Amino acid sequence: MTSTNFRPLHDRVVVRRVESEAKTKGGIIIPDTAKEKPQEGEIVAVGSGARDEAGKVVALDVKVGDRVLFGKWSGTEVKLDGEDLLIMKEADIMGIIG
């Protein structure tokens, strides 16, 4: 997504899903039709932050490059520069991996 000029507003982030393994530990190959969409992703863009009661901008806890876990139904799916991405609020992110 480096070629796009898209920047999310406020406390929103853009997430690229990280694809899960197509094969189980036992060697069984999982077809695409049986896979659930992954709930893990990489942050590719962040907004400037939300405003607190005093009007001061509060920076987000996540940054570009962070690997995160998010809820199954979190975010809005969009296509930017031909790539399928999610736009969600930082509050929809459950945590940072690693």
Curated annotation (Swiss-Prot):
Keyword Cytoplasm carried by entry: yes
Species this chain originates from: Agrobacterium fabrum (strain C58 / ATCC 33970)
Keywords: Chaperone, Cytoplasm
NCBIfam families for the chain: PRK00364.1-2 (NF001527), PRK00364.1-5 (NF001529), PRK00364.2-2 (NF001531), PRK00364.2-4 (NF001533), PRK00364.2-5 (NF001534)
Protein location: Cytoplasm
Residues passing through the membrane, by range: none
MF terms in GO: ATP binding; metal ion binding; protein folding chaperone; protein-folding chaperone binding; unfolded protein binding
High-level lineage: Bacteria, Pseudomonadati, Pseudomonadota, Alphaproteobacteria, Hyphomicrobiales
BP terms from Gene Ontology: chaperone cofactor-dependent protein refolding
Family matches, as InterPro entries: Chaperonin_GroES (IPR020818), Chaperonin_GroES_sf (IPR037124), Chaprnonin_Cpn10_CS (IPR018369), GroES-like_sf (IPR011032)
Role description: Together with the chaperonin GroEL, plays an essential role in assisting protein folding. The GroEL-GroES system forms a nano-cage that allows encapsulation of the non-native substrate proteins and provides a physical environment optimized to promote and accelerate protein folding. GroES binds to the apical surface of the GroEL ring, thereby capping the opening of the GroEL channel.
Subunit structure of this chain's protein: Heptamer of 7 subunits arranged in a ring. Interacts with the chaperonin GroEL.
Predominant location category: cytoplasm
Protein name: Co-chaperonin GroES
One GO location term (cellular component): cytoplasm
Similarity field: Belongs to the GroES chaperonin family.
Gene it is expressed from: groES
Pfam families documented for this protein: Cpn10
CDD domains (UniProt xref): cpn10
Cleaved signal peptide residues: none
